[in-house]
């Protein structure tokens, strides 16, 4: 008690200041980041997606496929406008690419070479068709992950999605709600959407999604080397 009573006001202020600094510090280190990702493009609506992103000064990540030559110029626009171009699949034919290890490797390498030839970018990020937790692959997923590691590729899954390619007929508002019910649980959220002609509601939902994420304090970023590795399957 004597020691407590002998403490001066200076000690109290020091403790309060220290507590305040600690509280402020703890607030400043909590950085909320959202990553908008689009699978399966380019498509006829990729240009509209890029226009909306530009209007909102937001960068995203496009996990693209390679089967449609008329969309190849869109790869260049994605890169030129500062977005991350990433590998999804050349063919996107699950029954083929997951039938054997060699098929998987050939599919990845074919698209990686194509993207380099068209854009000059050596893409270093990958998303498994169906995600790394897919139940289609005939090859152990860890073997495929070992290949990606050896090829200098980092794979990303997601922890929020709008279900645009799963449930038809959803409104743009419903798509946003689907995302936020999961995304708001995380400081770092990777959001799965699709760049497909059948998913135009996703395009319509984008302005509202961007605004609501920003209202909740998220910084919207493209995937890069600093992005947390949100992965469904790990070694």
Show which residues each predicted segment covers:
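Catalytic domains of cell-wall/extracellular-matrix polysaccharide-remodeling enzymes
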Residues: 70, 92-192, 196-214, 218-219, ...
């Amino acid at each position: 008690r004597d020691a407590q009573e002998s403490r001066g006001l200076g000690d109290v202020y020091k403790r309060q200041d220290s507590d305040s600094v600690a509280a402020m510090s703890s607030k400043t280190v909590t950085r909320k980041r959202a990553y908008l990702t689009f699978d399966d493009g380019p498509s006829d609506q990729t240009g509209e997606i890029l226009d909306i992103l530009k209007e909102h000064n937001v960068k995203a990540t496009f996990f693209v496929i390679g089967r449609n030559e008329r969309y190849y110029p869109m790869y260049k626009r994605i890169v030129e406008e500062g977005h991350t171009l990433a590998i999804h699949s050349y063919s996107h034919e699950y029954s083929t690419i997951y039938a054997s290890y060699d098929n998987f490797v050939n599919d990845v390498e074919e698209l990686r070479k194509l993207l380099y030839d068209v854009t000059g970018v050596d893409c270093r990020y990958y998303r498994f068709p169906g995600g790394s937790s897919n139940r289609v692959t005939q090859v152990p997923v860890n073997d495929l992950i070992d290949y990606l590691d050896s090829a200098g590729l980092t794979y990303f899954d997601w922890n929020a999605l709008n279900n645009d390619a799963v449930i038809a007929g959803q409104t743009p508002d419903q798509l946003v709600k689907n995302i936020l019910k999961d995304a708001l649980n995380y400081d770092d959220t990777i959001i799965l959407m699709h760049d497909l002609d059948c998913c135009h509601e996703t395009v319509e939902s984008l302005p509202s999604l961007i605004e609501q994420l920003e209202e909740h304090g998220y910084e919207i970023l493209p995937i890069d080397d600093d992005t947390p590795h949100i992965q469904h399957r790990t070694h």
